[in-house]
Amino acid sequence: MNTLEKQNEEHPDFQSLIKLIDDENEYIYENVKDKFLSYGKDSMHFLKDYFDSDNPSVAERSKEIYDIINFNFLDKKLRDLSYKENFLEEAAFTIASHEYPELDYDNYKMILDKMAIDLKEQIEAKYADFVTVYDKVKMLNNYFFYEKVFKGNTRDFYEADNSYLNRVIDRRTGNPISLSLVYLLIAGRIGIKFSGINIPNHFIIKYKDDIDEFFIDVFNFGVIISKYEALNFFKQFGIYEKDFDNIPFLQNAEEKDVVFRIFANLINVYENEPNDKKVEQLKKLQSYFG
C-alpha cells in the first residue's frame, strides 16, 4: 500500500473533500478547508499531490490550506520553544521549515553529529594526550572552512536562503548569524561552548573560560580576535580594560536574541521583495522571542 492509499484509508474524507475544494460556493469551500485543517499534517501530505493540478482552483486552494496548516504548526512549535531552554538549534531549523515544510530536522542533526565526530577523530589523532581550546578551534577552522568549504555569501548577502539553516548546510554558505550558528553547533558537539555576540550590522561569537577569552568572526573565515587585540581596537574610542566587560554590544546574546535577529533578517528580505503575507507571518513568529 502506498502512502496516498494509506492516508485515504485512514481519512476517507480526503477524496470527497478534494472533489469539493474548487466549489464556487464560498461556504462550502470554508467547510472543506476547516475539515482539512482538522487533520493537520496528514492533510499536508495529501494536498501536496494537488499543487500541480490541471485545475488552477484546486492547485491554488490546496496550496493555501497546506500553507495555513504549516504555519499553524510552526506557530505552536515556536511559541512552545520560546518558554524552554537550549532551544536555539531546534528553533533555527523550525524557522527554516516555514519556507521548507518538508525539512527533515533529524537528518540535519545527523549531518551535524557526523561533522563533529569526524572533527573529534582528527583532534584525537593529532593531540593524543592534551589539547587546548585554542588548538581545537584552529582545527575546527581548518575543518569548517577548508575541508567542508563553508564561506560567507558575499555575492548575494540578502538572499533569504542565507538565513535558513538547512540551506546553509546544503550550500555551505550563509550570512554572519547562520554561519556562526552552524559553527557553534559543531563546536558544542565537541565540548566547546561559544556565545553569540550581536554587534551592530554583524554577528560574531565569543569563547570565555577562566583562562582564555577570544572572539571569532565566522563570516570572515574564522578570524580569531584575542581580548588583547579587541582592547587595543577599543582604546581609540576611549574604552579601556576596566570598561571592556560592560560594552553593551559585546555582551553574550541570549538564545531569544539570536532567534529574534534571524527573523529580523528574513523580515527585511521579504519586505524588500515585497511579500506582505510572509512579513506578517514572520513578525508574528518573531514576537514570541521579543
Task: Write out the residue ranges for each language-model feature.
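A structural boundary/capping signal
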Residues: M1-G290
